[in-house]
Every structure is written in C-alpha cells, then in structure tokens.
Amino acid sequence: MGHQISKEDNGEQSNSNNLKKERRYTTNSSNLHFLYQQEEGIGINYKTGSANNSLSNSTNSNNNNYNNTNSSNNNNNSGNNKKITESTSLEDFKQFSTTLSISSTTPPDTPIISYNNSNNNNNNNNNNKSNKAVHFTRTRSRSLNITNTSRNLKVTSSPIIDSQVCAPNNSYNSSIQSLNSLSSTNSLSINTNTNTSSSLSLSSNSSNNSLSTLTNTTTTTTTTTTTNTTQQQQPIKGRKSKSSNALFKSLRSSLTGSSSSNSNSGKKRSSSISSSTNSLDINSANNNNNNNNSLKVSSKKSSKGGSPNSSTESLQSLSTSASASSLTSTPPLPPKSNAFSKSQNSSASSLNKQVISSLPPLAPTSTLTTTTTNLEVSKESLKPSSTPIDNNSVADSSYNNNNNNNNNNNNNNNNNNNNNNNNNNKNNNNLLDRLTDQLHRDPFFYNTNTAYQEENIIVEEVVVKEEEKSLPPKKLPPPLPPKNFKQTTTTTATTTTTTTTTMNPPSPIIQNVNRNNSSSNNSSRHELLRKSSGILPPQTEPTYPSETSSKRSSVEIKYLEENHKYQIFDRLGSGTFSDVYLCINKENGKQYAMKIIDKSLVTMIAQHTDMKVETEVNILKQSFHPHVIQIIDHFESELYYYIVTELLQGGELLYQLEKNHPSTNENVSNYTEEHARKIIKQVIQAVGFLHSNKIVHRDLKPENILFRDKSLGSILKIIDFGLASYVDHDCNCNNNNDNNNNNNNNNNNNTNGEVIQPSSPPPTKLIDVCGTPEFQAPEMVKRLGYSYPVDIWSTGIILYILLCGHPPFQGKNNMIVMSLIIKGELNFDSSVGWDNVSESAKDLIRKMLNPDPEKRLTAQQVLLHEWITTSSDVNGSPQLGAPLFYKQLRRYNSQRHFEKIGDTLLKSQRFIYMSPEKDYLKRRSIQL
C-alpha cells in the first residue's frame, strides 16, 4: 500500500516526438473533445494519452490519470460499488506526492515532461489502469493559448472523487484546476486552440486558481483529508515566445475589469514549476451503498522557488474574473444526507486531524463559491534552464518544506492580497483615467460640475482640474458673431449723418483707393469719405463658402435682426457677388433695400482687380443725383457687408416695358420713340454725372436700371455700383485731340528746342474685364485699356434694345458675341423691327456704338444730339415695331431669365479663373 509506481514508456515517447500530423479524438458518449497538434518549430502543444496510445481508455477509466489521491476498489454489498480508502500512515501519505521525471528527447531542446501518478494500493482489477501514465510533450512555439473548457457533470449514485490536473508549469498558460468525478456518466470537455486565451478552467463559474467549496451541513461528519504537495524544484525554462508580449498585452487589456476582494483571491501562480499557486479543493462525496459521506479536502501547496532562476520578477499581474454561464455547465450540488458513516480507520483519522489543523477554518456551506486570483508570469521562467533537475532531491525536500510552506502561506496570501488589490485598482482606473482626462480637456465640458460616486474618481478629477488651471484659457469661436458693437457717428463732407457699426475687436484701417487725384481738394474729400465708410476688409485670406451667396444663412439673418434696427424679409434680386433683400426699419417702419455682399468673394476678386466694397460705398455717398440710387446705411459682420439703400418698387426697365404692353394693359398707350427718348435721356444724365466725378460704372445694362414706381412715366435710377471705379483722367477724345494740337503748336513755336510737357498727365486706363459680355465695349474685349467711353457704349446698346426689342450682338456663346462686338456691324433692317424707327435715332446709335473709343460720343455730346433734344407728342409718334417689337422683347426677356438661372449655377460652382497670359478676370457661362 505504501508502494509508489513511476512508469515511463520510452517507445511511446519516441513515437509522440516523431508525430507531425494533426489528430482529433472525439468521444461522444462522455462528451470529451481534445485537439492537439505537434510539429517542431511551430507551436507549443501538449499531448495527453496512455502508454498504449489509447486516449479514450485512459480518460474513461475509473482511475483518472489526473487523480493524485489513493483510491482502491473493493466489493461491498452489491459487489460493483466503489469505495474510497485513504492511506493509513504518514509514509503512505508522503508517497502520494506527484513524482516528476524528465527525459530528454531529440532534438535536445524539446524536453518531455512526464507526470506519473499511481495508486499505492492496487487490486488485480486496476493494475493495468494504475500503471498508465500521462505524458505532456512541449515543443518550441510562437504562442500558446488554451481556451476555457466546459464540463457537464451529472449526479449519479457513484461518489465524487477529487482530481487535480497536472499541467506543466513552465508553459505560458495559467494553472489548471479541475473537479472530476469517477462516474462513467461524468463528462469532461477540453478544447485547445492557438491564440485564443491563456486560461483553462473546468468550471464556468470559477476562474484560474479559484477556491471551490462544496460542503454539506449534516449532524455527523467524517472528514478525510489528503494533502498533496508539489515539490520545490527549479523551473524548466525555455526560450521566450515571440508573441508572448502580444499575448500578455491582450490578456492585460481584456482582464483589467476584474477585481478580487476576498482574502483567498490574492493568490498568485507563476507559469514556472517552482512558483505554483495554492489551490484548495473541498469535495463532498456521497456513497449510497455504504451510507458513508466524507468531506475530502485536498490541498495543493507549494513554496516559492529559492533558486536564483526561480526568484524572478513578474512581467505583469493579470487578474481574471468569473463570467456567468449556462445552468447546464454548472456542477450540481450533491444531495444532503441525514446520516454519515462513522466507520473510519483510526490511523486515517489521526492523520486527517493533523492535516486539518494546519488548514484555515472552513465555514460549512452548501453553495459553490468562487474567487478570482492573479496570474503572474516570470521572465526567468521563459529562459532556458542551465542546470538539470534532480527528481529525488525534489521529492525528498518537498515534504520537509511542506510545514514551512504552510506557516508562510498566510503571510504570502496577505502580501498577494495587497498587491492584487493595488493592481486591480490600477487596472480598473486605467481606462477611467484616460476617459476622465479626455472629458476634462474637452472645451465644451470645461469647468463643469460633474458628480462622481467613487472617491478615487473624485481625486482624479481634482488633479485634472489643477493641471488645467496652470494652462492658458482656450479661446473658442462663438457660435454667433459677438453682439457688442461700437456705435460711432460720423459726418461726411456733404453734411449727411450716418451711423456705422464696427465689430469688436476693430479691424485695421481700410487701404487707400487706387486712384491718383490731381486736385488736393478732391483727394482730401475722398479720404474723408473712406474714413467715414466704416466698411473694413477681413484680416485673413477668404475661402470659398460652402453655400451659394444667394442663400443666406438663417443664423446670419437672425443675428442681423437682433443686433440692428432692420428686419429682413423677402429677397428682391441677386447679383454676381451679392443679394438684395427687402428690409424695414424698426424705428420708423420705412422700407428699404438691403444689399448683402459676401466678404470672401469680394476679397478674392479684389486681389486681382480694383473692385472694393469701400469704393462702392464711397461712390454712393458721393453720388447725390436724382437718377442714382441713394445710400441709407452700411455696416458689416464677420462674413458679409451690408448696404442699405432706398427701395425702388418699379422693377427693371425691360420687364416694365413688357408688362405695359397694350394687349395686357388697356390703360397703357402704345410704346413709341418718345418713351425710349425719355428713358435714355435719364440714363445719359446719370452717366454724365458719374463721369464728371471721375467715376465709371462699367456694368450698365437693363437689369441695373430700375423704375422708382410701377408707372411707365416714372423716373429711372441706376443701381449696382459694385464694379464702379474711379479713373485718373478725362479720356474725352476731343480733349485729348485739343491737348495734342496745343502741344504741337507749342513745339513748333519753341525755337530753343525745349519740349513742353502737356498740361494734363498721361492717361492711365483701366484694364479689368468686367460686366456682361453683350454690353462690353470693344476696347474692353480687346484688353487694350478703357475709360469713360465704355459706359457710352453700354448706353448705346440699351438704346438699341429700346427701339427694336433685342440687342445688336447676339450669339450662342460669349466668343461669338465678342467677335461680333469687335467687328461692330450694326443691322437696321426692317426684318428685325426697324421700320418705324427714325433716322435720327439710328444716327445716334451709330455714334454711340463706334468701335473707336476716341471717336465715340461723350455724355454731354449725347445730350446735345438732335434726337435727344427734339421732343414730340407721345400719341403723335409712330408705334415702335408694332407686334414684332413685343415679340422680340418677350423673347429677349425670357433669354435673360434663363441666363440668370445659369449665373446662379455659375456662382454656386465658382467657375472663375484667371487668364494664363494676363491677369484678367474672366467668367465662364453655362449654355442652357
């Protein structure tokens, strides 16, 4: 009975080492699954099996290979029942310790670890089964992961025997703890995979190194205790796996949420043999045949390795938490029994008392309690061992060191608990610290009072706030423009008082307008106008807006209504860079037109042209003429300029003519040359006024000429001075010719040969190409420089349309239109509606549309023309074009309507590019 068997089959070991193929063993009856793969240089795998390569026989036998207890089969009452007998002497108990044998195989760096657990008291029926050994073969690997295993335990009449799984502790997986039954109906399911998990547990409700308690509260209890000790030995060290660091990092990230608060949860277990954990299994077995219930306590204890190789620093303390599983995988508790057998060997009782006295007291309970512990992997255990292991010395010293281990167990557990609690606190707060830091650095949650329930979180919150106090405050852009404006009242040179608003902080002073005045009085006057404008350019380079300028943001309109005295209503019209809205003054209730200009577009164009918003404002302030629109107020925001002008309700020129057709309105008389004469006279008067103030409009067209009211005889006004500019000289060809003649006469009279400079400076013409192609002058199309005559050309095109209903130069695209403009060929045929037009009107058109700008009439000369000065009765003059005029006018208005749609699309897509040969701005039109 005190005999110990250690048997190794060398033939099987050699066969297992040479095995390089994958095998799968499946036993459906016992629900056992085991998959292994052994191949040198690929992975660390563990092969289990009996000496005769029969895995099913070794696992299904009543004498479990993982069982370290002394069991024997005796025939009682029925003859087939099993009975548990324990060793009756201390020597026998000593021999119950696991014997470790190491045999080197080929290649030499691939050792085989054989655990041979035998039965001291063997009967004839169990000799063959007890001699079978369990072999664990380790080969070199990149990584090893063992998944959690599941088991299905069924309660039968057979007793439940404790069993311990002997796994090589130098592997990278955690310790294995099992609760197995000798019943043939009990099933064990083990699955081994690679790169899945590093923990193997036989209970879904328990974690690695768990404490499983299974007791029955009864009146009389007979306790049998068997203590198995793991010998103190040096770790079998191997090469560190390449993916071990990645494995430990993945485990650390996935297991940070667990925490252990019990006293037994702080037990650590190293992956080396020298530092194994202390596991305590208390199993209750019920024998129905003998009416004998015994509480079996098997304690597996080990001491810390004292060798330099075993006393290593841990890589990382990893904690695992038990997860809830299905009810089928939870081992059921054995039924309670009212009576227990008192028949027990005296020697066994005395031995059990000695062992139990060294164990901590256990509270009787009928539930299965689990705790969580830490898994510590040693760096030194992953290195190759330099010294062999003496199995005899390890076996002899294991029992001697058992008492010392028991004495130091409590101290080690306390230290482990403290370390484990600290590690768990760090792991639990690791993610929380990052989230808290990110939360407090978020500007939208800055200085918020967030209530936290845990004390450690409150401490971290205070630390983060103290760090942020040292940092400079963040400047965040407001969701809306600031509301604090500085109201300033300025007075212009014409004694008109306007109220301007500037943003806070103030923008830099506006730049001087690009013009050189010969008169000091004019320059001082314009300088005063620029200072009083209050329109300041943006400081940074603009970018293209995401939305079209025709669709103003509701936020901008709301901001404008809240901070100014104007309330915005419907949109009246749109241009290339601006939109016009109807607005009402909140103070007096008067209606005005508000022009909203996109700052980004204006600033972009201003980099290549002389078009500036402040120039438009200054021109409007300077232009007090009955046929020029009047400015009321102006201000700006972060994104837009705002110009408030008088409201013109009469509509555009050509649309008003189409609306006042006799067929649609009976009260309106026929349209004649007299109507066209009155219209063009008002336009020429306004153009002459602008030219006298050294201003060129550059965008005269029917869309920019509006009636003050809806009556046909209402006065007209010129609008849209966005492209207007100042010029430096008078380009009147007559004046130039007079100056040239005077210079020639002076040169002829000069006998000394001195050159007399002309009285006026040399002309400096504009070169920017702007306006609508149908109304552009030839000198602008040719890019030769232009000045005031371009407005005369545009006025002549308007007069041509007023007399026949369509423009003189039309084409499918802008290139055709420009080529026709350069040719300058005019068609006055009767087929196009010139039958009833007088020759005087045709003569004025020819002179106004002269391709040579020097020979083109000026504004004063147009007003002195015969056709303008001659007045006639409206009813007495012939009707212009009869039905043909209105037909062509209606067609032309429809064409302009579609062109507006194209311009809107063009403006939304920003099809604006620079000419590669010269810095001229061009626009690409969309053909509909």
From Swiss-Prot:
Molecular function GO terms recorded? ATP binding; calcium-dependent protein serine/threonine kinase activity; calcium/calmodulin-dependent protein kinase activity; calmodulin binding; myosin light chain kinase activity
Q: Give the residues the record marks as binding ATP.
A: L572, G573, S574, G575, T576, F577, S578, D579, V580, K595
Lineage: superkingdom:
Eukaryota
Signal peptide boundaries: none
Chain segments carrying region Disordered: 1-26, 53-84, 99-150, 193-346, 359-431, 469-552, 738-763
SUPFAM superfamilies to which the protein is assigned, alphabetical: Protein kinase-like (PK-like)
Top-down, what is the taxonomic lineage of the species of origin?
Eukaryota, Amoebozoa, Evosea, Eumycetozoa, Dictyostelia
Q: What GO cellular component term, any one, is given?
A: cytoplasm
Activity regulation information from UniProt: Does not have a calmodulin-binding domain.
Q: Where is the composition biased (Low complexity)?
A: 53-81, 99-131, 193-230, 250-297, 304-346, 359-373, 400-430, 488-502, 514-523, 738-750
**Coiled-coil regions listed in the entry:** 399-440
Enzyme class comes to transferase
The protein's job, in short, is: May phosphorylate a specific serine in the N-terminus of a myosin light chain.
As recorded in UniProt, its EC number(s) are 2.7.11.18
Q: What is this protein called?
A: Probable myosin light chain kinase DDB_G0279831
The active site annotation covers D699 (proton acceptor)
Q: Which parts of the sequence belong to the Protein kinase domain?
A: 566-868
The reply to whether Nucleotide-binding figures as a keyword in the UniProt entry is: yes
According to the UniProt entry, which residue ranges have a biased composition of type Basic and acidic residues? Answer: 1-10
